[in-house]
Amino acid sequence: MVKWDGEFSPVYSTISSTPEYKPTLLGEIPSLGKDEAIKALDSACNAFDKGKGLWPTMKVVDRINAMENFVEEMKQKRDVVVKLLMWEIGKNHTDSQKEFDRTVDYIYDTIEAYKKIDRDSAKFQKHSGINAHIRRGPLGVVLCLGPYNYPLNETFCLLIPALIMGNTVIFKPAKHGVLLISPLMEAFKKHFPPGVVNILFGRGRVLATPIMESGKVNVLALIGHSTSANSLQESHPKKNRLRLVLGLEAKNPAIILPDADLDLSLIHI
C-alpha cells in the first residue's frame, strides 16, 4: 500500500442519525488523480510483465492457496464490512449480511470452477480427427469497475475470476459503497504479490479515462451503464484488442394489473 498525503473526500451515510437529518460522516477516501492512476497502471503492467510475472506464471495450486487464504481472512472482517455496507448505501442489515455471505460463497465456487478448468485442460480433446491440448491463460491487465447497488458482490464477481486466472487488476470501487473495501485492503496486500491488486479511490472519469487512453488495458470489466462502457471503449486506442466483460442496463419485464394507476406505475417502473 502507498501512503497518501493529498486531499481526501468525505463519505456520508445515506441514513441520518441526527434529529435535524444532517448528513452522518462515515469516513473519508483519498482523492486520487491522473498521476496516481498511471502509477497504478504501471504497477499492474510490471506485475504482469507480458505474462512472465510472478502471479501469471505461478502454479495453479499456489494461486488457489492465495485465494483461499484471502477469503478466510475476509470472513473475519464480516461484521465491519456488513456495517459499512448497511450505513453507506442504506441496505438493511439482513440484506447486507446476505450480500457478504453470497460473495464468500461465490469465491469458493470460483475456486472450484477453476480447479475443474485445470483438470479438464490436462486432457486431450479430439475433434474431426485432430487431437488438441487446450489450456487457458491470463489475458493481462484488467480494469474492474463495479456498481453501487451491490458494491461488494457484483464487483467481486468481476475481480475474483480475473485474479485467480493470473491477471493483474486495477480496481476502482463504486462511488457509493466504497468504504467497505478498506477492511479488506490488508488481506489483499498480504495474500497477493505486489502490483497484482491495485485499488484506486476517486472519480471514475478522472481515473479510468487516462488508464484506458494508455492502451495498456487488456480487459475492461464493468457493471454499470452503457454510456460509461461506450465512453471507456472509445478512449482505448486499440479497440480491436480490447476484451470486454460487461453487465449493463437490465431489460426486466413488468406486470401492470388492470386496476393499477398506469401513470403512477410508469413512474415507479
Language-model segments: residues:
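Short, charged helix-to-loop "capping" segments that act as catalytic/coupling loops
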Residues: 13-24, 45-60, 193, 213-215, ...
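Active-site/binding-pocket entry motifs
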Residues: 17, 113, 261-262
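Glycine-rich loop-to-alpha-helix module at the N-terminal edge of alpha/beta enzyme cores
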Residues: 20-117
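Conserved small/polar residues in nucleotide/adenosyl-binding loops
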Residues: 267-269
